[in-house]
Swiss-Prot record:
It comes from Homo sapiens (Human). Keywords: Disulfide bond, Glycoprotein, Hydrolase, Immunoglobulin domain, Membrane, Phosphoprotein, Protein phosphatase, Receptor, Repeat, Signal, Transmembrane, Transmembrane helix. Residues 291-384, 389-483, 484-590, 591-726 form the Fibronectin type-III domain. GO terms for cellular component: cell surface; membrane; plasma membrane. The modification Phosphoserine is found at S1208. Its EC number is 3.1.3.48. This is Receptor-type tyrosine-protein phosphatase T. Residues 889-1143, 1175-1437 form the Tyrosine-protein phosphatase domain. The keyword Transmembrane applies. It catalyses: O-phospho-L-tyrosyl-[protein] + H2O = L-tyrosyl-[protein] + phosphate. It is a single-pass type I membrane protein. Residues 1-25 form the signal peptide.
Length: 1441
């Protein structure tokens, strides 16, 4: 019964479970339906753990009681009672299918409780390799019957594979897992995607390997795709691209491959219908190649290396498709590679002297195929020449004995070698010998050269060198700073002693160490032959300029030894002193003054006189002598007035035999005459061997008293006439011849006296009539006399036994000088009250002495028709010549040679024509300046210039044309060759629109050929400019100083109105030109007219000074013999005369600042005899030379329409000085009563005007605005009676015509009210506004000619100076006004100019300044009190320092 039941159940189940679809279909080898034993299909099972294994079940043959077991014939595992994870394997036979095919099977999961019985995994093992991970699996709940699954397998011959079914149990989950109907189909699966052939992937080590899995089938988002490694490691895949609806692809990468990455990989996909498995593809990892040996070095250069790569022996895989060289510096981090395509390779563009590391890189195919660099070749390139020498080399510190250089720091980029040297080479010339030296520099960018010589021109350069070469910097030429100089050579000090003077000269120090600027000489008396001499004050100090290596010390005490300590100075200070001693000669005793020559008592045979002791001078009085001289008829009164001392003793007894007119009546010892006492001449006594016989009653006598001093072999004598005694009157009728002679002498004396009185009276009257001033004329007369007396002074010093020289007078070639009486037989120095006539002023660095030249014979031949003119007759002569009655300037000028008078063949040569500005003003052959010939140019010796003789100075001048562009270099060659220290320029660069001269001087430094010219200083003055240069020639260490005197006030046409400015210019040139310098170079445009005027004036001033005469005609004639047409027009010829006349009338009135205080008291002291002073004489001369104003000179002010604009018609502004108004004010004219005035420094610096009238206030403010006036100085009080009312706004603003004046501020400082206004032209607002200060000086009462306080007026001047410095840059003008624009305004302008002169030139010349002001306005400084006041303010100004 039981068996029947089972059978029935089995049948029932068969009926319930439908058969497997296609269960009995035919399949390829490897399939199995399990109807027979599975081994018949080639299947096998592997016994699992604890007997867990696959069993073949055939329920048809053996039914199963458990309903969970399906019916049929199949393979199954029973997981009941199994531990979790137990596995059972069913192995299919090995298959060798080629290409893609399908394996499908059915599986069945069942359990009683419907829980999962476990898992079913399917493995595809290829070529007997590892099992790996399952390609398909299922787990979970039981299935609802048999479920079909597909395996799409892609394999390719000769590979084979084996499918393994694995059952995995789950603990506590009993059930059954069955597999049935396994088929191997020769076509792709219906549902499961299949893969195309997976290709092998070859990569290089370290690269990412990418596998691309291409599947056929339909992609579903639920499909799972992965890459399965041979050893079973899975990597998920992502579909990257769907090709079409039946094909898709996915990629996966194996990152950072290495040899351990070498393996086989296949693609696996799991879909709802099953799994697809690709073939295994191999991942091949190649090792990039590396050379075994380093490259071989073949050759080395500075910027290249030749190498051989040595790439045949390698480590790694080939093939080698690329060879590269990698190189880098051993100290750097960068590397560079070059492709090598030849057996040897040259590395270019390397850096010199750098160590390189060179390796070879080999590359095989594929990304990352370049292997690591091979072993390195380490080598160093050679050094290369430096790129350039040191750059931007400059001197940053210059000292006397050292220089500090600085240059642009450089490194390897410049040196191109790590081993280099930096050297400084320098050379200089010392004592005409060239020295060269070099020093190695250790610092990087600066170096100090030490041990140099001061003030030395040094040429230096830096040298940068390395083993391969060297480069130099640009040459620098620098001069070390000055140092204190060495000592003046003691042996060079020479002294010429006189009585009260010592002339001392010396040579500069051997080591000047710079430009000697000053010499300081300290002197003091150290002993005297005269024990009574007070030497306490005999000391002092003088300073001499660099070009004055001599000095005449005056005011010394005779017979005294002086020590002189000399030291030189540069800009750095004084050097060591050197001391010498020189003694003055003894002087004749100083004789006392006798009020009258009337004797105390007189008889027929005696005369009693008073004897006074003499004052010793340098040596004690040795003896007194009383001399009696007989006066005879043949001696004129003039000759008798000349006192002659008696050096040869003659006794009364010897006088007759020697026919001597004099005899010694007595000789007294100094002890015998201690005090004043009477002495009777003719007392018939003997004194020290000399008989004093009675006098003859019939003779006339002169009684002389003389004193002698003897010391050191010298004998000096001085004498005085004590009395005269006439012959006695006889009562007999017979007249003795001696009486007659004596009476004749007396009568002649009386007549001569009367004649002299009449002549003097007529001279005074003539002087007044001609308005000449004796003081002015006497300047040149006295200078001439001084020269003669100085020349003859040496003859008058007596030796021990020399006879007394008689005074001599050297006569001029054209007239006789008057004789001068002298009370001393030895005249070594001329002393006069005039300050311009001191023997030689003691100089400091600020003084301005004017040198004189030694008088010699006249250098110009005197024509008998044009004789030289005495200075005293010059005014009369010029007046007569200007009248032109019969013979005047016109005829005299026409008598001069005109045009060419000598050959000028050289100037006419074709090669020299372009060197001449004008074809008719060229150089004579005989006097032309010949330049040194330049190499290769025989015509380079020509320049249009001629030597011109001066007064006793051959070739003292060079007259030349103004340089042209082609001749500038030649001009400077001439300056250097001739050693000229002064250039006089009497033209402007452009006149009337025409170029008269090219600018041939630099603003800073310029090189003309081989001459380097550097501007040092510019001193602008009102009428001329002084520029100071240093001049240096290439190859010479000498640096010379040169001054260019540029006279800027010569008008474009004609001549200057007055010679005042030109005379000051001439004196300045004369003073500043060193005596040892070469010719003064003078030029205008052509080098004829103005040039000749300057030379003629300078020459004639020298003649007037030395001889008291002038010879202008013959001077010009001689000038024209040396250069054509010097003094070119009659107008210039007359101007030369006028200039000389003004110089003679006015004299030289300049006073050095250092002497002003002492001289001022002398010139202001009243002479009791004349009741005058030199200042008064100056002012009288000033009135004489002040130009008379003619009506035609002030024609504009005289126009009727301008009458009401003038306070007075007496003094009107000159037409040429008028400031015409520019701003338009209705119908008002452009006239204002004002004049432009020069200051000392600035032309037209002042605008002098009257106090504005009510109808001219607008004109006044137009003047202020139009002429850029920054200051207004008001010097008068407001007075309504005089129509002097306020013309400015107070606290507000006001309009005056077109000018708006706005009050800004005001303050009061003692006597000064200081206001500030802002003004603008309302008609031209675009011009902006200007700031103007208004200085109202209230300290000058109306009733006084001068203000009571000099200090307060100086405060106005200082306020004006300060304002100009701070606000207008000294460019604005100053309006100065008083009531009439005359005396007060002129006084203020003169004071301002004097202050400027003191500051700029250290001299005071009040006369010159006032004369300059009066040339433009005749009422400037109206009274003597105002003129004196200017002097007094100058003294006050000096006291403020």
């Amino acid at each position: 019964m039981a068996s029947l039941a089972a059978l029935a159940l089995s049948l029932l189940l068969r009926l319930q479970l439908p058969p497997l679809p296609g269960a009995r279909a035919q399949s390829a080898a490897g399939g199995c339906s399990f109807d027979e034993h599975y081994s018949n299909c080639g299947y096998s099972v592997a016994l699992g753990t604890n007997g867990f294994t696959w069993e073949q079940i055939n329920t048809w043959e053996k039914p199963m009681l458990d309903q969970a077991v399906p019916t049929g014939s199949f393979m199954m595992v029973n997981s009941s009672g199994r531990a979790s994870g137990q596995k059972a394997h069913l192995l299919l036979p090995t298959l060798k299918e080629n290409d893609t095919h399908c394996i499908d099977f059915h599986y069945y999961f069942s359990s009683r409780d419907r829980s999962s019985p476990g898992a079913l995994n399917v493995y595809v093992k290829v070529n007997g390799g590892p099992q790996g991970n399952p390609v398909w699996n299922v787990s979970g709940v039981v299935t609802e019957g048999w479920v079909k699954a597909e395996l799409a397998i892609s394999t390719f011959w000769p590979h084979f594979y084996q499918v393994i079914f694995e059952s995995v149990s789950l603990k506590g989950h009993p059930g059954y897992i069955a597999v049935d109907e396994v088929r191997v189909l020769a076509h792709p699966c219906r549902k499961a995607p299949h893969f195309l052939r997976l290709q092998n992937v070859e990569v290089n080590v370290g690269q990412n390997a990418t596998f691309q899995c291409i599947a056929g089938g339909k992609w579903s988002q639920h499909d799972k795709l992965w890459l399965q490694q041979w050893n079973g490691r899975d990597t998920a895949l992502m579909v990257t691209r769907v090709v079409n609806h039946r094909r898709f692809s996915a990629t996966v990468s194996v990152a950072d491959t290495a040899q351990r990455s070498v393996s086989k990989y296949r693609c696996v996909i799991r879909s709802d219908g099953g799994s697809g498995v690709s073939n295994y593809a191999e991942l091949i990892v190649k090792e990039p190649p590396t050379p075994i040996a380093p490259p071989e070095l073949l050759a080395v250069g500075a910027t290249y290396l030749w190498i051989k790569p040595n790439a045949n022996s390698i480590i790694g895989d080939g093939p080698i498709i690329l060879k590269e060289v990698e190189y880098r510096t051993t100290t750097g981090t960068w590397a560079e590679t070059h492709i090598v395509d030849s057996p040897n390779y040259k590395l270019w563009h390397l850096d010199p002297d750098v160590e390189y590391e060179i390796r070879v890189l080999l590359t095989r195919p594929g990304e990352g195929g370049t292997g690591p660099p091979g072993p390195p070749l380490t080598t160093r390139t050679k050094c290369a020449d430096p790129v350039h020498g040191p750059q931007n080399v400059e001197i940053v510190d210059i000292r006397a004995r050292q220089l500090t250089l600085q240059w642009e720091p450089f490194g390897y980029a410049v040196t191109r070698c790590h081993s280099y040297n930096l050297t400084v080479q320098y050379q200089y010339v010392f004592n005409q010998q060239q020295y060269e030296a070099e020093e190695v520099i250790q610092t990087s960018s600066h170096y100090t050269l030490r041990g140099l010589r001061p003030f030395m021109t040094i040429r230096l350069r830096l040298l940068l060198s390395n083993p391969e070469g060297r480069m130099e910097s640009e040459e620098l030429v620098v001069q070390t700073e000055e140092d204190v100089p060495g000592a003046v050579p003691l042996e060079s000090i020479q002294g010429g002693p006189f009585e009260e003077k010592i002339y001392i000269q010396w040579k500069p120090p051997n080591e000047t160490n710079g430009v000697i600027t000053l010499y300081e000489i300290n002197y003091k008396a150290v002993g005297s032959l005269d024990p009574s001499a007070d030497l306490s004050s005999q000391r002092g100090k003088v300073f001499k300029l660099r070009n004055e290596t001599h000095h005449l010390f005056v005011g010394l005490y005779p017979g005294t030894t002086y020590s002189f300590t000399i030291k030189a100075s540069t800009a750095k200070g004084f050097g060591p002193p050197v001391t010498t001693r020189i003694a003055t000669k003894i002087s004749a005793p100083s004789m006392p003054e006798y009020d009258t020559d009337t004797p105390l008592n007189e008889t027929d045979t005696t005369i009693t006189v008073m004897l006074k002791p003499a004052q010793s001078r340098g040596a004690p009085v040795s003896v007194y002598q009383l001399v009696v001289k007989e006066e005879r008829l043949q001696k004129s009164r003039r000759a008798a007035d000349i006192i002659e001392c008696f050096s040869v003793p003659v006794s009364y007894r010897n006088a007759s035999s020697l026919d001597s007119l004099h005899y010694f009546a007595a000789e007294l010892k100094p002890a015998n005459l201690p005090v004043t006492q009477p002495f009777t001449v003719g007392d018939n006594k003997t004194y020290n061997g000399y008989w004093n016989p009675p006098l003859s009653p019939l003779k006339s006598y002169s009684i002389y008293f003389q004193a002698l001093s003897k010391a050191n072999g010298e004998t000096k004598i001085n004498c005085v006439r004590l009395a005269t005694k006439g012959a006695s009157t006889q009562n007999s009728n017979t007249v003795e011849p001696e009486k007659q002679v004596d009476n004749t002498v007396k009568m002649a004396g009386v007549i001569a006296g009367l004649l002299m009185f009449i002549i003097i009276l007529l001279g005074v009257m003539l002087t007044i009539k001609r308005r000449r001033n004796a003081y002015s004329y006497s300047y040149y007369l006295k200078l001439a006399k001084k020269q003669k007396e100085t020349q003859s002074g040496a003859q008058r010093e007596m030796g021990p036994v020399a006879s007394a020289d008689k005074p001599t007078t050297k006569l001029s070639a054209s007239r006789n000088d008057e004789g001068f009486s002298s009370s001393s037989q030895d005249v070594n120095g001329f002393t006069d009250g005039s300050r311009g006539e001191l023997s030689q002023p003691t100089l400091t660095i600020q003084t301005h002495p004017y040198r004189t030249c030694d008088p010699v014979e006249m250098s110009y031949p005197r024509d008998q028709f044009q004789p030289a003119i005495r200075v005293a007759d010059l005014l009369q002569h010029i007046t007569q010549m200007k009248r032109g009655q019969g013979y005047g300037f016109k005829e005299e000028y026409e008598a001069l040679p005109e045009g060419q008078t000598a050959s000028w063949d050289t100037a006419k040569e074709d090669e020299n024509r372009n060197k001449n500005r004008y074809g008719n003003i060229i150089s004579y052959d005989h006097s032309r300046v010949r330049l040194l010939v330049l190499d290769g140019d025989p015509h380079s010796d020509y320049i249009n210039a001629n030597y011109i003789d001066g007064y006793h100075r051959p070739r003292h001048y060079i007259a030349t044309q103004g340089p042209m562009q082609e001749t500038v270099k030649d001009f400077w060659r001439m300056i250097w060759q001739e050693n000229s220290a002064s250039i006089v320029m009497v033209t402007n660069l452009v006149e009337v629109g025409r170029v008269k001269c090219v600018r041939y001087w630099p603003d800073d430094t310029e090189v003309y050929g081989d001459i380097k010219v550097t501007l040092i200083e510019t001193e602008p003055l009102a009428e001329y400019v002084i520029r100071t240069f240093t001049v240096q020639k290439k190859g010479y260490h000498e640096i010379r100083e040169l001054r260019l005197f540029h006279f800027t006030s010569w008008p474009d046409h004609g001549v200057p109105c007055y010679a005042t400015g030109l005379l000051g210019f001439v004196r300045q040139v004369k003073f500043l030109n060193p005596p040892e310098a070469g010719p003064i170079v003078v030029h205008c445009s052509a080098g004829a007219g103005r040039t000749g005027c300057f030379i003629a004036i300078d020459t004639m001033l020298d003649m007037a000074e030395n001889e008291g005469v002038v010879d202008i005609f013959n001077c010009v004639r001689e000038l024209r013999a040396q250069r054509v047409n010097l003094v070119q027009t009659e107008e210039q010829y007359v101007f030369v005369h006028d200039a000389i006349l003004e110089a003679c009338l006015c004299g030289n009135t300049a006073i050095p600042v250092c002497e002003f205080r002492s001289l001022y008291y002398n010139i202001s002291r009243l002479d009791p005899q004349t009741n005058s002073s030199q200042i008064k004489d100056e002012f009288q001369t000033l009135n004489i030379v002040t130009p008379r104003v003619r009506p035609e000179d002030c024609s504009i002010g005289l126009l009727p329409r301008n009458h009401d604009k003038n306070r007075s018609m007496d003094v009107l502004p000159l037409d040429r000085c008028l400031p015409f108004l520019i701003s338009v004010d209705g119908e008002s004219s452009n006239y204002i009563n004002a004049a432009l005035m020069d200051s000392h420094k600035q032309p037209a610096a002042f605008v002098v005007t009257q106090h504005p009238l009510p109808n001219t206030v607008a004109d006044f403010w137009r003047l202020v605005f139009d002429y850029n006036c920054s200051s207004v100085v008001m010097l008068n009080e407001m007075d309504t009676a005089q129509f002097c009312m306020q013309y400015w706004p107070e606290k507000t603003s006001g309009c005056y015509g077109p000018i708006q004046v706005e009050f800004v501020s005001a303050d009061i400082d003692e006597d000064i009210i200081h206001r500030i206004f802002r003004i603008c032209n309302m008609a031209r607002p675009q011009d902006g506004y200007r700031i103007v200060q208004h200085l109202q000086y209230i300290g000058w009462p109306a009733y006084r000619d001068t203000p009571p306080s000099k200090r307060s007026l100086l405060k106005v001047v200082r306020r004006l100076e300060k304002w100009q410095e701070q606000y207008d840059g000294r460019e604005g003008r100053t309006v100065v006004h008083c009531l009439n624009g005359g005396g007060r305004s002129g006084t203020f302008c003169a004071i301002c100019s004097v202050c400027e002169m003191i500051q700029q030139q250290n001299i005071i010349d009040v006369f010159h300044i006032v004369k300059t002001l009066r040339n433009n306005k005749s009422n400037m400084v109206e009274t003597l009190e105002q003129y004196k006041f200017v002097y007094e303010v100058a003294l006050e100004y000096l006291s403020s320092f």
